[in-house]
Each structure stands twice: as structure tokens, then as C-alpha cells.
Amino acid sequence: MTDMNKWRHIFKLDPAKPISDEDLMKICTSDTDAIMIGGTDDITEENVAHLMHKVKCYSLPIVLEISNLESVVPGFDLYFIPTVLNSRDVKYHNGLLLEALKSYGTLIDFNEVVFEGYVVLNPDCKVAKLTQADTMIDDEDIEAYAQMINDMYQLPVMYIEYSGVYGETNLVKAAADMLTETQLFYGGGISNYEEAEMMASIADTIIVGNIIYEDINKALKTVKVKETH
């Protein structure tokens, strides 16, 4: 099984967004720990498979973060299933997992499945609107979510998602301080090395996504956080 406990940096690629072969090569040979493929809109079996096959030319772990069952294809090292704990809609807590088990329960290799405890904190992002997430969260709330994930559900990953904006470091640190076993992922708004360095000093693993499509050189510089963390 792929060991993700040592991952400090992940590049997240959206299969619905175009990326040149040259930029993809730079991303995949950058010394990042893994490539995550995932997104919210227009995620299909075809574009997921197309991007996966391109990434698999390089020797690094590749993960699919599942947003719908129709886009799930074989060949990934790990499959991440989000449960959005601050969603007001129960289907985003366990609905995706329920449908996966109903459709593929006897075929799933559970050694390849990672259940992520998601907390979405940017009210304006697509995933917050889609999941009807309650983003009005203070330190006490995030600490309680962290305890829920670490101590009660005992999930391997807590993912704090700001999706497009840079997050509040005090909230990320409040969560980090409560986690003893669960790995803390942070994603959202990292657009330069300094922001990456700050979040890497708090979270176990940082996820860098949008900046790949805006400024590839700034994206590549974020990998340097591995030298100090």
C-alpha cells in the first residue's frame, strides 16, 4: 500500500482544466510527493482517465479524489473519498460512500481507499455551495471537528479546504493541535512559496492547485517547503 504519512506536498490537478504537456512534466518531476486528481465541475470518466494516463508516465503516487462515481477509473494508487462534516446535507457526509458500496462493494480494495474528514471554510467556493457547508466556524468548532475526526471517527485524514482563498492560520493551528493520529491536509489559496511555508509549518501536508494554472513557476517554488518540513 502507498504510504502517504510521509507526504508533505501534493499537487492537485483538475481534469477539467487544460494543462500543457510541458507544464505537466514540470509538475510531475518537481519532487512533489504525489499528484491528486480531482475537482468539482465537469469531472468525467474520460477526462479523469486521460489525465491519469499522462501522469502515470512519471514515477510518483497518483490519487483520485472522488467527486462522483461516474468518473472513477481503475489504475490509481489511492482513492480518496471526502465526507464533508460541516455540510448541512447528509448525502455529503456518507452518500458518496453509500453509493460506492452499493455499486462496487464486493470489488473495492479497501487498502486503496482513504476516507477524508473534510471541513470546507470558504463560503464562496463551489464546493461550499454544492454541499451547503456551514462555513461560519470559530476555534471551538474546528477543535470539535478535529476531535470528531481524530478520536471518534478515527479517520486517517482531516482536510481543511479553503478552495481558492488563503485560510486563517489560527483555525488551521487549532485543528492541528487537536490531532494526534490523523494527518492534517490543508488546501486553498496557496499562491507563492511564503504562503506554502506558513501552512506547511502547521499542517502535515499542503495541497497546491489553482496556482498551477495561473503561474507555473510560483507553483513549482512551493515544493521547496519539503526542504524545511
Curated annotation (Swiss-Prot):
Sn-glycerol 1-phosphate binds at residues 12, 159-164, 189, 209-210. Its EC number is 2.5.1.n9. CDD domains: PcrB_like. Prenyltransferase that catalyzes in vivo the transfer of the heptaprenyl moiety of heptaprenyl pyrophosphate (HepPP; 35 carbon atoms) to the C3 hydroxyl of sn-glycerol-1-phosphate (G1P), producing heptaprenylglyceryl phosphate (HepGP). This reaction is an ether-bond-formation step in the biosynthesis of archaea-type G1P-based membrane lipids found in Bacillales. It catalyses: sn-glycerol 1-phosphate + all-trans-heptaprenyl diphosphate = 3-heptaprenyl-sn-glycero-1-phosphate + diphosphate. Its cofactor is Mg(2+). One of its GO terms (biological process) is glycerophospholipid biosynthetic process. It is an enzyme of class 2 (transferase). InterPro entries: GGGP/HepGP_synthase_I, GGGP/HepGP_synthase_sf, GGGP_HepGP_synthase. GO terms for molecular function: heptaprenylglyceryl phosphate synthase activity; magnesium ion binding. Keywords: Lipid biosynthesis, Lipid metabolism, Magnesium, Metal-binding, Phospholipid biosynthesis, Phospholipid metabolism, Transferase. This is Heptaprenylglyceryl phosphate synthase. Homodimer. Pathway: Membrane lipid metabolism; glycerophospholipid metabolism. Pfam families: PcrB. Mg(2+) binds at residues 14, 40.
